[in-house]
């Protein structure tokens, strides 16, 4: 969105423009009453193709609704020379001359007033109000004119953590979480409203931790309160023995999830119906399709997930080849792909149909008997932050070891091929590039990598974190050093954190 208003807004600000804009917001954007919601559902269709979806926009100069995605509103703007339109989902004002969403103080004020009215009609409390400084705060600002500026070389947010005795597993996850963009924005905007005792609330401690990290202080922080709360709420992690960073991540997300409350004030006790910040950022939906080999009936279930655990070549689990070798041969269906293994290879294997065999027959609702079947996992809904766990630690009755297979992972990742909607592009388990691979909604950027050095019995965790777009740093407990992109991509990789490149705000 353009930071300042454009001159083309002035052409709209004539006669009763404020009242006209209010009517549009009341009837077609926020729709507070049941009557206006019915009117919106009936009236808001593209005047060219009749579609209800495709990011409908309304012309501000005349009565016209058009698709933004299919450029129908663009055609109208060009033909009629009507430069401004309003997004009917989010209320943003788009200028076709500037080719951007623009900001105008007067229009923004009207939008917020009408949104508050709509929330009140629906019995919803205001989610978040814009900060308006009090007289005392204005006085403080006048007496303290110096401001800290964020530049490309700024290191604010970088802070080491003291190792309290085999707590590198915790420190590496804390570094990844404190550099998760949306989580950082949530805590630095003081959005958490605690209804527990603050000294027992992990969310309160994380809020304080974010304040410590972004205070500008450079001395290493001592996370003793965080460690105490983790021990209190996740007893299996208590003690000074070495722990698994992945296990700590899941435990921390679980406790944070339980201590959070969603915007409607309901307890966050159901991962499928929760609006807490943890679920908003980290929860995705994993679709499991079980297909009967006799009648080909499909049974589908969707389960929430916070991370995706991926098998590696070299483990006792067969790692099927997913791309042909130099000679195109496969030995017993169990040979490894030629050359380096990639994260994409692991994801292809994860989403490949698996024959369950005669020893794992499932009762088919169509055949009404136990039949052999195939099972396939795909992504029904992607989280904002996707965490990939490379299963480097193998535990079995006969074997305990670390798998050191190098896995190549990219700076940018497109998850479109692994979506449930792209399932038809993989015929009989063979990977094909889907037609909609240019879908920006499924594209991710790498922002943190947790590594494990050493053996299963004795090791150490470190984290690479992205501070700015192309600036990487290595966090080794209290020591933070500059790192190159090559350092990051050449690392072994244990936990890989990716953030969506494009977000739609609600």
UniProtKB/Swiss-Prot annotation:
Upper lineage: Eukaryota, Metazoa, Chordata, Craniata, Vertebrata
Top-rank taxon: Eukaryota
Main subcellular location: nucleus
Segments forming UBP-type zinc fingers: 4-121
Binding annotation for Zn(2+) 3: 59, 62, 76, 82
Pfam families, sorted: UCH (PF00443), zf-UBP (PF02148)
Official protein name in the record: Ubiquitin carboxyl-terminal hydrolase 22
USP domain: residues covered: 159-501
Keywords: Activator, Cell cycle, Chromatin regulator, Hydrolase, Metal-binding, Nucleus, Protease, Thiol protease, Transcription, Transcription regulation, Ubl conjugation pathway, Zinc, Zinc-finger
Record-listed E.C. numbers: 3.4.19.12
Family, as annotated: Belongs to the peptidase C19 family. UBP8 subfamily.
């Amino acid at each position: 969105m353009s930071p300042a208003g454009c001159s083309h807004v002035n052409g709209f600000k004539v006669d009763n423009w404020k009242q006209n804009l209010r009517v549009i917001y009341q009837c077609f954007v926020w729709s507070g009453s049941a009557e206006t919601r019915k009117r919106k559902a009936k009236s808001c269709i593209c005047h060219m193709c009749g579609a209800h979806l495709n990011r409908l926009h309304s012309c501000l100069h005349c009565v016209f609704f058009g698709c933004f995605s299919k450029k129908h509103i663009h055609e109208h703007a060009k033909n009629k020379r009507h430069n401004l339109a309003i997004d009917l989902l989010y209320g943003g004002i788009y200028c076709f001359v500037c080719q951007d969403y623009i900001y105008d103080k007067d229009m923004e004020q009207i939008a917020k007033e009408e949104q508050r009215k709509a929330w009140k009609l629906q019995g919803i409390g205001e989610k978040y109000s814009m900060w308006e400084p009090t007289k005392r705060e204005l006085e403080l600002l006048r007496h303290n004119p110096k401001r800290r500026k964020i530049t490309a070389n700024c290191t604010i947010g970088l802070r080491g953590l003291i190792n309290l005795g085999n707590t590198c597993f915790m420190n590496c996850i804390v570094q990844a979480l404190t550099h998760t963009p949306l989580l950082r924005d949530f805590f630095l905007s003081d959005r958490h409203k605690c209804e527990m005792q603050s000294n027992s609330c992990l969310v309160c401690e994380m809020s304080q931790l974010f304040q410590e990290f972004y205070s500008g202080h450079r001395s290493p922080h001592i996370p003793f309160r965080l460690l105490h709360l983790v021990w209190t709420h996740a007893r299996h992690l208590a003690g000074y023995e070495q722990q698994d960073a992945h296990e700590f991540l899941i435990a921390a997300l679980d406790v944070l999830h339980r201590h959070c409350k969603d915007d409607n004030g309901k307890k966050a006790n159901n991962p499928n119906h929760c609006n807490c910040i943890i679920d908003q950022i980290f929860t995705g939906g994993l679709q499991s399709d079980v297909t009967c080999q006799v009648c080909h009936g499909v049974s589908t279930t969707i389960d929430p997930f916070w991370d995706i655990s991926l098998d590696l070549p070299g483990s006792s689990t067969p790692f099927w080849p997913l791309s042909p070798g130099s000679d195109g041969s496969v030995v017993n269906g169990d040979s490894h792909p030629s050359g380096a293994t990639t994260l994409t290879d692991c994801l292809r294997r994860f989403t490949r149909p698996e024959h369950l065999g005669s020893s794992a027959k499932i009762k088919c609702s169509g055949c009404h008997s136990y039949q052999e079947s195939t099972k396939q996992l795909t992504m029904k809904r992607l989280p904002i932050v996707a965490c990939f766990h490379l299963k480097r630690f193998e535990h079995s009755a006969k074997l305990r070891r670390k798998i050191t297979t190098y896995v190549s992972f990219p700076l940018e990742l497109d998850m479109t091929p692994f979506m449930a909607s792209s399932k038809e592009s993989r015929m009989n388990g063979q990977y094909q590039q889907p037609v909609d691979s240019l879908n920006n909604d499924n594209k991710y950027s790498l922002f943190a990598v947790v590594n494990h050095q050493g053996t299963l019995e004795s090791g150490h965790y470190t984290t690479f974190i992205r501070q700015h777009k192309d600036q990487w740093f290595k966090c080794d407990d209290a020591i933070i050093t500059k790192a190159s992109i090559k350092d990051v991509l050449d690392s072994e990789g244990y936990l890989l954190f990716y953030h969506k490149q494009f977000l739609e705000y609600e």
